[in-house]
C-alpha cells in the first residue's frame, strides 16, 4: 500500500467518525472530552491524520459502541492444515423435487 492509499483509508475513517459524532449530535468539544483527547486530536482524527495514537481510535470505537468492529482486525486465519482437518458440510445443490 502506498502513502496515497493509506491517506485515503484514513480520510475515509475520519469521515465516518465525524458522521457518527454528528449523528449523536455531539459537538467536537463534548465528543473529545468523552474520548479523553483534545479537540485538536479529534480534529486530526476526523481529517485522517496518520499520527493519531491507536488508543484514541479504540476509545472512539468504544464510545460509539463499535468496539466489536475490531474483532476482525488482525484475526488469525485458519492454517491450511486446520482447514483440511475441519469437518466438511455438504451443501445442497438444488431444491428438492415436489411431488
Regions found by a protein language model. Give the residues of each.
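A short, Lys/Arg-rich alpha-helix, primarily the initiator
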Residues: 1-23, 73
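Short alpha-helical DNA-recognition segment
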Residues: 25-43
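Short, charged recognition helix plus adjacent turn
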Residues: 71-99
Amino acid at each position: 500500500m502506498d502513502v496515497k492509499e493509506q491517506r485515503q483509508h484514513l480520510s475515509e475513517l475520519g469521515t465516518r467518525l465525524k458522521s457518527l459524532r454528528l449523528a449523536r449530535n455531539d459537538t467536537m468539544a463534548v465528543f473529545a472530552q468523552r474520548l479523553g483527547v483534545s479537540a485538536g486530536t479529534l480534529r486530526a482524527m476526523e481529517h485522517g491524520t496518520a499520527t493519531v495514537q491507536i488508543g484514541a481510535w479504540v476509545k472512539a470505537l468504544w464510545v460509539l459502541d463499535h468496539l466489536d468492529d475490531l474483532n476482525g482486525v488482525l484475526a488469525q486465519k485458519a492454517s491450511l492444515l486446520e482447514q483440511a482437518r475441519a469437518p466438511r458440510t455438504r451443501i445442497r445443490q438444488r431444491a428438492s423435487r415436489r411431488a
